[in-house]
Amino acid sequence: MNRLGGGKKGKAMGTFAIGGSSGFAIGPLFAGSIAYTVGPHGLAAFTIVGLIISTVLFVLMPCIVTQARTIDQAVAMENPTLVAKPLKNYWKYFGILFIIILSQSVNFRVINAFIPIFWTRELGTSPEQGSFALTIFFSIGIFMTYIGGLLGDKYGPIKIIRLSLLIWLPAMFLLTEVPTFSPVIMMPIAYMLLLMIGAAKALSYSPVIVLGQTYLAKSIGFASGITLGVSQTIGGIIAPVVGNLADTYSLPAAMMTLVPFLVVGLGASLILKDPKKLQ
């Protein structure tokens, strides 16, 4: 995607991420429907779909590689001086970016795990409403990942990452306080804050990946492994700790421990530097 994006890497990554966001939002609905109507063995249908998509990608991959080379040549002709510069890795700033990735991953994975429980246990809703809240949380990401990519191309990825954290931090703090609100406004505010958190996470998805690949221009594969792979899993390590805190104290109190991670992430974003100024 880095090569296919040409000069619009954020837009390309945002388009690519729509597929993943759609899968997170729609997948559980399909899986639940199949499991309830056909039975657990019906989930084998996902294996068939995976095989079909893998076959299509295998057939089309030579065309994709050819297209990437064509785009590389076009970029080289338009920016001969840029291409002539040797590629460099800026590990210091990638390390700072990793702090942001960690703070976002911890919050996203824990929220993902505890939204249904928070809705049912703390807000007094039905399990169905808890699942619906989770679907809303993922659905907003389908649109905001693409918008985040466009904004990253226009204003630069660092500004969008900062904007994302500026939205996410207060929304996360207020969400933990929602159970103390009046019942009349409790649910509307809860859904509004949930949308803000989902939008904030998705908004910075493409800019984080693009910025990571730019900081490690000589090691794009490694950068992709961190920004695309580790970012999706490392937060899950903290989830059991938060769950234990929820059992010991309360779920809102446990979720409040996520706020300092966002504070650190926001602070780290303020010392990031534009890769263009480092060259």
Where are the language model's segments positioned?
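Cytoplasmic helix-loop-helix junction between adjacent transmembrane helices
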Residues: M1-G19
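Helix-loop-helix hairpin linking two adjacent transmembrane segments in secondary transporters
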Residues: F16-C63
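Flexible cytoplasmic inter-helical loops of multi-pass small-molecule transporters
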Residues: V59-V83, Q279
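Extracytoplasmic gate region of multi-pass secondary transporters
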Residues: K92-T135
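Helix-to-loop junctions at the C-terminal end of transmembrane segments
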Residues: T145-G156, A246-D247
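A late C-terminal transmembrane helix in Major Facilitator Superfamily
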Residues: K218-T248
